[in-house]
């Protein structure tokens, strides 16, 4: 395991329980859900937009560009983007990361 320190827990709280951070050149979306901290690649697999709408009731995150929705626990795309009906598309998931609170700072396991 290679834990990397990111932002303070207070910064996550101030951002409404969701935040995107840069860890070694990777943008990672972190959200505090009802069952703890979750992290996943913050770049949508459809059009490379940054994710940003965490829905705690469904434990999903939505891409603000085209509406694709991903499970925060698995990274699986559960709702494809809203694009032209005949547009070619792959339902690619996102990498998930373990996240922990260590002495008031969020750490991400980048392995």
From Swiss-Prot:
Residues that, per the record, bind [2Fe-2S] cluster: 44, 46, 63, 66
InterPro entries (UniProt xref): Rieske_2Fe-2S, Rieske_2Fe-2S_sf, SDX-like
Localization annotation: Cytoplasm
Domain of life: Archaea
Keyword Cytoplasm: yes
Required cofactor names: [2Fe-2S] cluster
PROSITE patterns recorded: RIESKE (PS51296)
Alphabetized SUPFAM superfamilies for the sequence: ISP domain (SSF50022)
Record domain Rieske: where: 3-108
Main subcellular localisation: cytoplasm
One Gene Ontology MF term: 2 iron, 2 sulfur cluster binding
Co-factor binding details: Binds 1 [2Fe-2S] cluster per subunit.
Entry GO CC: cytoplasm
DNA repair is among the record's keywords: no
Keywords assigned: 2Fe-2S, Cytoplasm, Electron transport, Iron, Iron-sulfur, Metal-binding, Oxidoreductase, Transport
Signal sequence bounds: none
Entry-linked NCBIfam families: SDX_Thmprot
Family: Belongs to the SDX family.
Full protein name: Probable sulredoxin
Originating species: Thermoplasma acidophilum (strain ATCC 25905 / DSM 1728 / JCM 9062 / NBRC 15155 / AMRC-C165)
């Amino acid at each position: 395991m290679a834990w990397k320190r990111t932002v303070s827990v207070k910064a996550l709280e101030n951002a409404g329980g969701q935040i995107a951070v840069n860890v070694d050149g990777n943008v990672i979306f972190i959200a505090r859900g009802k069952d703890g901290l979750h992290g996943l690649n913050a770049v949508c697999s459809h059009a490379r937009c940054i994710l940003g709408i965490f829905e705690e009731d469904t434990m999903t995150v939505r891409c603000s560009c085209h509406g694709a929705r991903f499970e925060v626990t698995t990274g699986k795309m559960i709702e494809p983007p809203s694009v032209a009906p005949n547009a070619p598309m792959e339902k690619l998931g996102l990498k998930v990361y373990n996240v922990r609170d260590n002495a008031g700072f969020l750490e991400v396991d980048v392995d």
